[in-house]
Amino acid sequence: MQILKVRTLILVVLFAIIFYFPVYSAQRFILDSHHHAGDNQEWVQKAVKIYRENNAMCCVLTYMEDFELVKKAIKDYPDVFIGYGAVRPDDPQAPRQIEEFYKAGFSGIKYHSPQKNWDDEKYYQLYRMCEYLGLVMIFHTGVTSRSINDMPVYQSMMRMRPGYLDAIARLCPRAIIQGAHFGNPWYEEAAEVCRWSPNVFFDITGSTLHKLIKLNDLTRFQKILWWSAGEGQQTVHTLKGGPEAFEHIVFGTDEEPEGLVGNIERFQLFLEANKVPEAIREKMWGLTMARILDIDPATHKCTRPRPLPPGTKLFDASRFGK
């Protein structure tokens, strides 16, 4: 009887360990670099379940109205959620909001809907602030969605062209910059920014993969991401010491948690159509962002807690590629 009780106790303890401390093993590590916060606990629980099932984490883009919800979610489920703030760059409160996100241990800032072009000097204060605080910067690039209504909105995709990130990457060479949606429809422009900017990455969330699959044109990216890392040794027309072309793409969803699996399937089709080598695929799925955010893919733990000390170099040219 005593032996039976001991065995039962052992089983209960093992179950508790497995349930509360998920083990991530052979399944591919995925880091969703572009996931928007929900506004209730149901979203939290749904995301935890789906992302854990797929050995995935997500960078949660959070406006101030959902700040407390996401801050608690990160504390409760650090193996799933990585905090990113979201600000409107023309809002006078934007610098204060960035400071609050930073102090709370968030790792990045998302910008959307500028009233001027992304590379306008008006926004340089925000960009330099993020660089100094070690915050990843995500910029919406290209076309943006809207609904059918009669409410006037001052918003233009022309102010969010991917080419504007070129100036920001040069202005903030220690920062990590991510363009959302690969600049849809300005894909070639986005690619050329990548070619000369080792600190710039793009996700291909939104309608891009839907469009390319429907048009049977997934191989289009082979034509615009045409260079290789070694070419800089032979020609002055490609960055010397830079990453491989496809390494500039990072996985993201920009959808509800239920959309994760569908996005994984479409991204896999994209990788296969473009014959991306396996080692680079793993970086695109999550290893690149894990390196940037100091995440251990095996445990989902952050190896360098946030907030980072001011002056931290997210992109350190002297260590690049090591």
Regions found by a protein language model. Give the residues of each.
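A cross-domain feature marking catalytic cores of carbohydrate-active enzymes
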Residues: 33-37, 62-63, 85-89, 110-115, ...
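Active-site environment of divalent metal-dependent phosphoester hydrolases
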Residues: 38-41, 65-68, 90-93, 117-118, ...
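Divalent metal-dependent hydrolysis catalytic cores, especially in the metallo-beta-lactamase
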Residues: 29-35, 46-68, 81-86, 107-111
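Active-site gating/metal-coordination segments in enzymes
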Residues: 65-159
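Catalytic pocket-lining loop regions of alpha/beta-barrel enzymes
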Residues: 108, 123-250
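Sec/Tat signal peptide C-region and signal peptidase I cleavage site
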Residues: 21-25
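Mid-to-C-terminal alpha-helical segments outside catalytic/metal-binding sites
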Residues: 4, 8, 27-33, 42-57, ...
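Bacterial N-terminal signal peptides
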Residues: 10-20
